[in-house]
UniProtKB/Swiss-Prot annotation:
This is Phosphoserine aminotransferase. Homodimer. GO terms for molecular function: O-phospho-L-serine:2-oxoglutarate aminotransferase activity; pyridoxal phosphate binding. Pathway: Amino-acid biosynthesis; L-serine biosynthesis; L-serine from 3-phospho-D-glycerate: step 2/3. L-glutamate binds at R42. Binds 1 pyridoxal phosphate per subunit. The gene is serC. It comes from Bacillus cereus (strain ATCC 10987 / NRS 248). Keywords: Amino-acid biosynthesis, Aminotransferase, Cytoplasm, Pyridoxal phosphate, Serine biosynthesis, Transferase. The keyword tRNA processing does not apply. Gene3D superfamilies: Aspartate Aminotransferase, domain 1 (3.90.1150.10), Type I PLP-dependent aspartate aminotransferase-like (Major domain) (3.40.640.10).
């Protein structure tokens, strides 16, 4: 069977050249006579892989020297707990901006550790927009302010990153890391599950300013303390070695594409193909405030569940798969991460045009 265009929100599409390289090196990595999956994480071979992955991420995101890059496990969902356990240590209070399901889950975990202040929320608008923050970030008696830069389920993103003077800004970038340029120095901590835009499932990346490491309470479990990973080059215990290796290959691929600025240009072009069609369509609509449209996750729907089901079935027959929207939103969702070629988006738009003509 030929490869399909996979619009899954995660685990998601990986660049074909990366998969082919993995296939080539799978049984015998670099003349070692064994697979990465069999290799000791204490070996010099793996040490060079994790070092290269870290330095590539630093280069691509222009990460300043005062930040650590940590390779973790447990997904972004474990970070919802690790962050308050490590950073909520002066005022025992943090601010959360609610823009979707994931930021809400992050807040709910933080409430188990300390006090949470909801600075702003777009829940009353069903998370179809990003709340305005004018003058809302003045409270300095917070240990950090948490945002989700891109809302995978609802299809929104921040256009401007909130300016926070004296409080560390913490960002969940799981679904748009490396998709557009960000000034890392504006953040105290950035985290992302790898399985959307970085690599395969099993790896979580954290980029943390060094002065935020080491402040966890003594009761914080060893494996939930950033200091454990910082002191041991992310090798305190066995890391997700294969996921780190594939992520390194994805970062090499991204560099070959021209880096983040080039991929951002490509992502803006790809998302415009779909948004331009949706804006003109009489059948398909998108619920998202146009100002805050995501470049990565694009929800859309028809007027009826029957048409949605028919659309999804026929799309699958054409090799356009995993387009079903999240159960909390319904309809359809196209996740068009870095690895999705423009041709895949164009094929989707062509099919949507045909479907609209058939169902006028």
């Amino acid at each position: 069977m030929e490869r399909v265009y996979n619009f899954s929100a995660g685990p998601s599409i990986l660049p074909l050249p990366v998969l082919e390289k993995v296939q080539k090196e799978l049984v015998n990595y670099n003349g070692t006579g064994m697979s990465i999956m069999e290799m000791s994480h204490r070996s010099s071979y793996f040490q060079s892989i994790i070092d290269e992955a870290g330095s590539l991420l630093r280069e691509l995101m222009n990460i300043p020297d005062e930040y650590e890059v940590l390779f973790l496990q447990g997904g972004a969902s474990l970070q919802f707990s690790m962050i308050p356990l490590n950073v909520m240590n002066t005022y025992k209070k943090a601010g959360y901006i609610l823009t979707g399901s994931w930021s809400k889950k992050a807040m709910q975990e933080a409430e188990k550790v300390g006090e949470v202040q909801v600075i702003a929320s777009s829940e009353n608008e069903k998370f179809t927009t990003i709340p305005r923050l004018d003058g809302l970030l003045g409270d300095e008696k917070l240990d950090y302010v948490h945002i989700t830069t891109n809302n995978t389920i609802e299809g929104t993103k921040y256009v401007d990153i909130p300016h926070v003077d004296k409080v560390p800004l913490v960002a969940d970038m799981s679904s748009n890391i490396l998709s557009e340029r960000y000034d890392v120095s504006k953040f105290g901590l950035i985290y992302a599950g790898a399985q959307k835009n970085l690599g395969p499932a099993g790896l979580t990346i954290a980029i943390i300013k060094r002065d935020l490491i080491g402040g966890a309470d003594r009761s914080c479990p060893t494996m939930l303390n950033y200091e454990t990973y910082s002191k041991n080059n992310s090798l305190y215990n066995t890391p997700p070695s294969f996921s780190i290796y594939v992520t390194k290959l994805v970062l090499e691929w991204l560099k070959e594409q021209g880096g983040v600025s080039a991929i951002e240009e490509q992502n803006r072009m790809k998302s415009s193909l779909l948004y331009n069609f949706l804006d003109e369509s009489k059948l398909f609509t998108s619920p998202v405030d146009p100002t805050y449209r995501s470049l990565m996750n694009i929800p859309f729907t028809t007027p009826s569940e029957e048409l949605n089901s028919e659309f999804l079935q026929k799309a699958k027959e054409r090799g356009l798969v995993t387009l079903k929207g999240h159960r909390s939103v319904g309809g359809m969702r196209a996740s068009i991460y870095n690895a999705m070629p423009a041709e895949g988006v164009q094929q989707l738009v062509n099919y949507m045009k045909e479907f609209e003509l058939e169902n006028r």
